[in-house]
From Swiss-Prot, chains A, B:
Positions bound to CTP: 54, 57, 140, 160, 169
Cofactor names: Mg(2+)
InterPro entries: CAA_C (IPR048833), CCA-adding_arc (IPR008229), CCA_tRNA_nucleotrans_2 (IPR042090), NT_2-5OAS_ClassI-CCAase (IPR006116), NT_sf (IPR043519), NuclTrfase_I-like_C (IPR011068), Polymerase_NTP_transf_dom (IPR002934), tRNA_NucTransf2 (IPR015329)
Lineage of origin: Archaea, Methanobacteriati, Methanobacteriota, Stenosarchaea group, Halobacteria
Family classification: Belongs to the tRNA nucleotidyltransferase/poly(A) polymerase family. Archaeal CCA-adding enzyme subfamily.
GO biological process: RNA repair; tRNA 3'-terminal CCA addition
Annotated gene: cca
Species in which this protein is naturally found: Halobacterium salinarum (strain ATCC 700922 / JCM 11081 / NRC-1)
Protein name: CCA-adding enzyme
Keyword hit for Metal-binding: yes
GO MF annotations in UniProt: ATP binding; CCA tRNA nucleotidyltransferase activity; magnesium ion binding; tRNA binding
HAMAP family named in the record: CCA_arch (MF_01264)
Amino acid sequence: MTDAAAVIERVRQRVDPTPAERRALAAAASRLTERAEAAIAELPVAADVVQVGSTARGTWVAGDRDIDLFVRFPSDLPREQLETYGTTVGAAVLPDGHEEYAEHPYVTGTFEGYAVDLVPCYDVAAATEIKSAVDRTPFHTTYLQEHLDDGLAADVRLCKQFLKGIGVYGSDLRTQGFSGYLCELLVVEYGGFEAMLAAIEDWQPPVVIDPAAHQQASFDDPLVVVDPTDPERNVAAVVSAANVATVQHHARRFRATPSEDAFTPASPAPLDAAALRSHIDRRDTTPLAVVLDAPDVVADQLYPQLYRSRDGVVRGLREHGFDVVRAAAWADERAVVFVELASAELPAVERHVGPPVSVGTHAERFYETYADDDGVYGPFVDDDGRYVVERDRDVRTAGGFARTELGTVALGARIESRVASGDYDVYVGDAVVEALLPEFESELAAYVDPKA
Amino acid sequence: MTDAAAVIERVRQRVDPTPAERRALAAAASRLTERAEAAIAELPVAADVVQVGSTARGTWVAGDRDIDLFVRFPSDLPREQLETYGTTVGAAVLPDGHEEYAEHPYVTGTFEGYAVDLVPCYDVAAATEIKSAVDRTPFHTTYLQEHLDDGLAADVRLCKQFLKGIGVYGSDLRTQGFSGYLCELLVVEYGGFEAMLAAIEDWQPPVVIDPAAHQQASFDDPLVVVDPTDPERNVAAVVSAANVATVQHHARRFRATPSEDAFTPASPAPLDAAALRSHIDRRDTTPLAVVLDAPDVVADQLYPQLYRSRDGVVRGLREHGFDVVRAAAWADERAVVFVELASAELPAVERHVGPPVSVGTHAERFYETYADDDGVYGPFVDDDGRYVVERDRDVRTAGGFARTELGTVALGARIESRVASGDYDVYVGDAVVEALLPEFESELAAYVDPKA
């Protein structure tokens, strides 16, 4: 047995559900389906029940206890009735459940220890004719049931555990990683987990995979996996370039040096104040933190806004002449944009380059603007023949930037409104330590020990 | 009379030689020519004497007292004999003169208060057949005598005084400005001084002027004036882009607001230590000076080496992460590369971006280099999917850079050898003040009051 095979065998023992687990889940799903069918029989409309998701496909990782049931209504049913009937069936199946809302309401609850979602959808003829995103899901299950066998399903479990271990599993907008469906398609595409790793090692982004050979749209993403049920959809649309690279890195590492580590999420020891101070001293940088109460929105809204804000703050600082070493954004009770700067203070003057002297009116206007201004050095002519002045900076400190200029940078909507009302705090240098610990002790631990 | 005409009239009174000055100069030139012809008569070879330069063309500025005589020998005369005969004639004409050496020796001395150069050259059929650069000069004089009249010659004097006033007169490699011959061609081309200013105001570099409409080479210069005596030569080759822009700036200023100031070189009051410190405080920058004894070479060798060294030091500092606000290079007894920095100190770590993870062997090698190095942060993967480490900087201070890294940057040859032997000093911050004053008090005065 190769090293890789031995490692994989040990991982299989962790991720493969036991026969008892399978039987229990199948029995629970069956009882739920019967309940749903009984409720449907009471309705003045025909509908059927399909089990979807990883537990329908046999690709769930041992210990996962999610059952997803979709109730398919005729596609000509008005939306309000679909919602009403769906809620009615949901309440009958999960009397202790509650409604949640995606594109339309669905019912979520627990049943015999399983987390159950009961989702109404339209029974359309093809995934390309869907009326709502959830209508597509049954087609995914059908496609995979046709293409997966027990061996591939087991390899999907390995793949999921691998991606969890390296921190890129999940198509939520915080992770920007790989969905379960994407794992399934990749394992099917390459014919197994190890073959998939071998293929990933050679990826040259942008990578395009089209299992059904029917791509009809072009995608500007580092990884494109055309949905076999919809030629215009990239299943990997949310996967970031960094996560594509991370998978590639770990595929290469695992193949060179197989280890169970890749299948185990890192959990760095939380960082205490002394350790954080020691890193800041060692790096001799200046940290800046913009801190606010986390906006009360779901994670898939919060994180894109937070990342956009981080990028906006970094861009703004750079445009003002600050040298950013690294930046991050985190959320817990509070949300934080954390920026590490080479220096938190700039000279009093900045070089302001104007137009080439040769551009006539425009150049003349620049010259006239500054010619009689005793507060600037110049205008003079640079080596390229452009007018230049050295003028006083508006903003000389990173803290000053964060306190007065955040309104000028691109921020996420809910963060922008907080900033507009001054409802945020700015910390610079050592003050950052007390401000962020212990709330962000895990995030800071990862920050000071960054890994591929 | 327009404002411009009134200003120009006053300048003419300063720059036009008086009839007495003209007569005296013509008489002196005539006597020198007779002496030279007498000496030639003693030689076993035929030759003639031509007066060249601005005093031959009537374009000299009042007070200039230069007479240039060229002795033209047959083009088949061996070079050693040309040199011997030239020196013989020179010694006869200027018994108190001494030899200098350009492409070949010539004699320079004084005669009745005039500075006289007596230069041997070959009498070739056309400027394109020259054997040495000086052979071209008589053709320039012939061309201009055909194209200049008294009015244009007077406007050439205005042009020269204007370019002197704004600091761009002289084709030496320190100034990188306009030669007298170039002034003459421009005034002829545009038909007068004011017409020239009007044309310059509209220049869109690169500007190409070809008086004889015979250009045969292409030139990568911001200003091209094809020599009417040589289709492959750009008379304006040494003029820098900055000087083209400077002329354009002042042409525009003069036409908008005529003033005699443009015809008067600026002479800023020398800067004392208190004033320099006050500027440094006000700008809140850190000055750095690399100082050495000026290499003992002529200015046309020294300044290109000095400018190259300045550019090399600036590039090196930037490559090491320093933010350079402005830089300069000056020479007197000592030579100095002066650099003004936003900050003289950088963080302990620097971001070192490696290859994209996807590039296989190259990426793997980068990862392996740092994977087990406890001294770095990372390797991790950046947003673009590249490996990154944050590693300790080799050089954290600008002074350290100047003391240990100058050998790694492009320097002028004679400065490079000084640096190689450690024969230079580095000053940072306030120490620069005492180190550079009073020797560079004028240069520093101009530096802290930069003008177009």
